[in-house]
Amino acid sequence: MDFHRLLQHKQQRWQRSSYLLIGLFLSVCVLYLLVGELWLSPFSAWSSLEQQLVWELRLPRLLAAAVIGASLAVAGATLQVLLGNVLAEPGVVGVSGGASVAMVILLLFFPSLNSPVAFMAAAVLGALLFTLLLVVMARKLRLTTARLLLVGVALGILSGAVVTWAFYFSDDLGLRQLMYWLMGSVAGVSWYQHLLSLVAVPVVIWLVLQGGVLDKLMLGEGHAKQLGIDIHRVRWRLILAIALLVGASVALGGVIGFVGLVVPHLLRLTLGSENRLLLPLSALCGALLLVSADLIARLALGSGELPLGVVTTTLGAPIFIWMLVRNHDSC
């Protein structure tokens, strides 16, 4: 009876958290559409200019931030299970860097292929390559947490060096595009670019539904096989899903770090590590975090706006340092 009550209490806590996050997300979304350089009133009729501002500028940007936030948070939570490392995150371990390098190569050598589909394909290939490299090294070399992080940092440095070299071989327009992808931003996202969202959203939903499978993987390969899990097939599907989400996120908004690290970790600390419940809340909380961060980026400067990646890094870096200190014994 005590166990039943404990389980019921845990379920109620997850439900209350879900309702709270949904309410916060909807409130922030409404605020996002109303505030900016031109503030709008929800209680008065909007002019044609104000309607165009919302439908053509703010709403596509809002949806882009939400999709990227959900994608990175779910990808981060999945990557942590896949690598067996709570400090794994697409930006920290270099997966986002791989996507950015592939896009830089596309912009420099194939500038005529300037379309969301081409950006998506290049970013997914780069993210897939770096994800495969990390998984193979983590499994074959039995890397500890510290060494895996060092490998990820090294991959990030390598991708940063490639992008820096690209600066010197690009014209002014190319340089501006490269800076855009490097620093992360959803400014100027159009409805046409949301073709990428049509790829990301189904993958997010599919990964959210894999929570039970991830819970079995956390028990170890032996137990997972006994429970009927095809380890090889599941791992490849998860790798491809992570690459698709990271690639779509980088193609849509550039390199945005720490979302996939902060969101799953804080949810695990407060609500537990059951992936069946963690993944949907990670998607919701990731969307809430990035929409809020982009709102800060829009309002922080009176004459302009901050890059979204700068805001998320400012918020996430201290938490990452705290996590490193907290996990120093296992490192």
UniProtKB/Swiss-Prot annotation:
Give the location in the cell: Cell inner membrane
- Asked if the record carries the keyword Cell membrane, the reply is yes
This protein's membrane topology, according to the annotation, is: Multi-pass membrane protein
Question: Which BP terms does GO give this entry?
Answer: cobalamin transport
Q: Report if keyword Transmembrane helix is assigned.
A: yes
Q: Which Pfam families match?
A: FecCD (PF01032)
User: What GO molecular function terms would the record report?
Assistant: transmembrane transporter activity; vitamin transmembrane transporter activity
Name a GO CC annotation attached to this entry: plasma membrane
Q: Which SUPFAM superfamilies match?
A: ABC transporter involved in vitamin B12 uptake, BtuC
Residues crossing the lipid bilayer are 20-42, 62-84, 91-113, 117-136, 148-170, 190-209, 240-262, 277-299, 306-325
Alphabetical UniProt keywords: Cell inner membrane, Cell membrane, Membrane, Transmembrane, Transmembrane helix, Transport
Source organism's superkingdom? Bacteria
InterPro entries on file: ABC_BtuC-like, ABC_transptr_BtuC, ABC_transptr_permease_BtuC
Which NCBIfam families does the record cross-reference, listed alphabetically? PRK03784.1 (NF003001)
Family statement: Belongs to the binding-protein-dependent transport system permease family. FecCD subfamily.
Give the function comment from the record: Part of the ABC transporter complex BtuCDF involved in vitamin B12 import. Involved in the translocation of the substrate across the membrane.
Question: How does this polypeptide assemble, per the annotation?
Answer: The complex is composed of two ATP-binding proteins (BtuD), two transmembrane proteins (BtuC) and a solute-binding protein (BtuF).
Annotated protein name in UniProt: Vitamin B12 import system permease protein BtuC
Q: Which gene encodes it?
A: btuC
